[in-house]
Amino acid sequence: MGAPTFHIAMYPWFALGHLTPFLHLSNKLARKGHKISFLIPTKTQQKLEPFNLHPDLITFIPVTVPHVDGLPLGAETTSDVPYPLQTLLMTAMDRTEKYVEDVFLGLKVDVVFFDFTHWMPSVAKRLGIKSVNYCIISPATIGYTMSPARQLQGRELTEADLMVTPLGYPDSSIRLRTHEARAFAARRVMKFGGDTRFCDRNFISFSECDAMGFKTCREIEGPYCDFLESQFEKPVLLSGPVIPEPPTSPLEEIWAKWLGGFRDGSVIYCAFGSECTLKMNQFQELLLGLVLTGMPFLAVLKPPIGAKSVEEALPEKFETSVEGRGVVHEGWVQQQLILEHPSVGCFITHCGSGSLSEALFNKCQLVLLPNVGDQIINARMMSQNLKVGVEVEKGEEDGLFTGESVCRAVRDAMEEGSEVAKEVRDNHAKMREFLLNKDLESSYIDNFNKKLQDLLG
């Protein structure tokens, strides 16, 4: 008799950086024969349809995102709104609770995978189904910022509290700087959807779900996973690296032709995801740093705060000075294919979990320039613990970087004969070989599937 199969619902936070990894996991679980109902904002569905590799088993369920005063009309995901308005988007998602419950009731699902919707475990319990908080944020970050060891101190956490690891945390090398601790302290208490604080939303999600899930490996984050399992007293399901399937379409000709004009390993690719918006001075310092390296570069960036377009934010005579060797592009690109291109030798990343995964699967050297939240601890883990990248130096108090610090990090990572470059290159090569082992992924998905069976009894 074959292994049991289940009807799984997916309802990730309305951000492409969450929707996409949930779909990658859905593809892996569909291979095991599970039926997936994937709830997704209506207009966003077409963006993900090309990545649905099992349309016979994975069905998209459209969700009309309720309008909330203050949101742009038609806004569906975080890429449609500036960062300060994400709290209103969370409010809109919270207002789908009744619709979601009705959908689950009609579909007769067995288990739901979710994140950020702290009401989901209660909905699941009412319907007699299980809930898994499948968290895109790394276990290292959750353990550092959201564990019961933090929450149960009986008062609001200060900057000083957050600059010290929580009791029992397994890694003393991860430390926050002053400006980072200040930002984390503010983020914990900010309202994120109605009157619910960000830290409370996450803590309730982890405390009341039946299991936690993460896209990681024990070989990389095992101690952090053990810490969370003991802190929350519930199972942790690890899906492994969840390597995206190779894209079916080739790299767009405009980029294939441009990258093809440079020697192997010589181009810097710089991208900060669909949400990161830099301040004007930091945007221009970043571009200055790219120019100072003397290397060809492709920078994919959003317009900085206060600018309507990337073009109007460029320094005077910038385009003339980098003509033929530098491009600043506003808009979506095929990042996975760009990172795979032989000309790309360095990736300056904001350290979002999806971008880091794609980077580790490829050969380019990593330069780490985190912006907010979990990106900071991701960068610290990559640079201090795993030593697979070089982090850009920032001011201790103000958190600002300079063009010179960007250039210095690139040179440290790229220069021939540099001990730092050799160390991160060797460590990255070992990590890449480990992650691309097909037996590794299949064993993790098998174990994930087994733990899911145990959970559903």
Swiss-Prot record:
Keywords tagged on the record: Flavonoid biosynthesis, Glycosyltransferase, Transferase
EC number: 2.4.2.50
Gene Ontology MF, one: UDP-xylosyltransferase activity
InterPro entries for this protein: UDP-glycosyltransf_plant, UDP_glucos_trans, UDP_glycos_trans_CS
Superkingdom per UniProt: Eukaryota
Gene3D superfamilies cross-referenced by the UniProt entry: Glycogen Phosphorylase B (3.40.50.2000)
Associated pathway: Pigment biosynthesis; anthocyanin biosynthesis
Tissue specificity comment: Expressed in ovaries.
Reaction(s) this enzyme catalyzes, per UniProt: cyanidin 3-O-beta-D-galactoside + UDP-alpha-D-xylose = cyanidin 3-O-[beta-D-xylosyl-(1->2)-beta-D-galactoside] + UDP + H(+)
Top EC class, one word: transferase
GO term, biological process aspect, one: anthocyanin-containing compound biosynthetic process
SUPFAM superfamilies hit by this protein: UDP-Glycosyltransferase/glycogen phosphorylase
Family to which this protein belongs: Belongs to the UDP-glycosyltransferase family.
Function field: Xylosyltransferase involved in anthocyanin biosynthesis by catalyzing the xylosylation of cyanidin 3-O-galactoside to form cyanidin 3-O-[2-O-(-xylosyl)-galactoside]. Required for the accumulation of anthocyanin in red-fleshed kiwifruit varieties.
Protein's UniProt name: Cyanidin 3-O-galactoside 2''-O-xylosyltransferase FGGT1
Organism: Actinidia chinensis var. chinensis (Chinese soft-hair kiwi)
